[in-house]
């Protein structure tokens, strides 16, 4: 089995490393554990950047931009993905995809296979690790989080041909130093993921508890196909 996990361990009493190891044990030698390892702090086109420079003078924002950390797949921590994601990313033998904004980290037999290809122009599309997980019919486990963070739904945005926009971020050069790179991809929009998830939850997920908090388990293919139908019908 291949398992994509989103987890917030806050208020669960669960510890990241023991949970990671328990999941790997359940998956077995042939299984693969995947987590998002996203990074927003190296981009000047992200909502988090706009929030941080709001109220700054042009000089202050330019100085802030110049000091932004460059993405390095080997060392840059994930941001806002939680302790479990970091415990996977930093584990011995972990693999990380190369995208400077929406990388994934994985452990297990097919980790390198799933994360080998991740072009700039496909944050979470068919050519990304998410697309590979969809084709492999992976499962999703969400612990103590809601559908508004369900990464799988983003793949449906590519299938419904969402409009494009420009992205820009700073990355580490192989020989040292840093450089800014600009590229086009679809405009990712998670504002209606809660509603998409509420409609999906009727009969398409298994519910339980981990650490006394809600847990959901479902097929990534069923989630993406549902989101594609929902977006086709309801997004303008």
Question: What are the language-model segments listed below?
Answer:
Residues 1-236:
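N-terminal and secondary-structure boundary signal
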């Amino acid at each position: 089995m291949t398992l994509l996990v989103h987890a917030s361990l806050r208020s669960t009493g669960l510890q990241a490393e023991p949970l990671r190891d328990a999941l790997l044990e359940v998956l077995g030698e042939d299984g693969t554990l995947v987590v998002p390892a996203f990074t927003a702090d190296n981009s000047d086109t992200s909502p988090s950047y706009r929030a941080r420079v709001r109220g700054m003078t042009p000089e202050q924002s330019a100085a802030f931009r110049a000091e932004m950390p460059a993405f390095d797949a080997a060392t840059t921590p994930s941001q806002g993905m939680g302790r479990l994601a970091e415990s996977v990313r930093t584990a011995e033998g972990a693999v990380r995809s190369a995208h400077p904004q929406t990388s994934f980290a994985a452990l297990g037999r097919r980790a390198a296979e799933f994360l080998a290809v991740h072009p700039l122009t496909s944050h979470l599309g068919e050519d990304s690790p998410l697309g590979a997980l969809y084709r492999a019919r992976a499962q999703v486990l969400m612990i103590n989080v809601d559908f508004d963070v369900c990464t799988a739904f983003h793949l449906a945005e590519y299938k419904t041909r969402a409009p494009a926009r420009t992205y820009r971020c700073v990355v580490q050069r192989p020989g040292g130093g840093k450089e800014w790179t600009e590229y086009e991809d679809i405009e990712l929009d998670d504002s209606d993921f809660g509603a998409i998830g509420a409609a999906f939850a009727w009969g398409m997920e298994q519910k339980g508890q981990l650490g006394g908090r809600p847990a959901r388990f479902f097929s990534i293919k069923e989630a993406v196909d549902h989101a594609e139908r929902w977006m086709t019908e309801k997004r303008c």
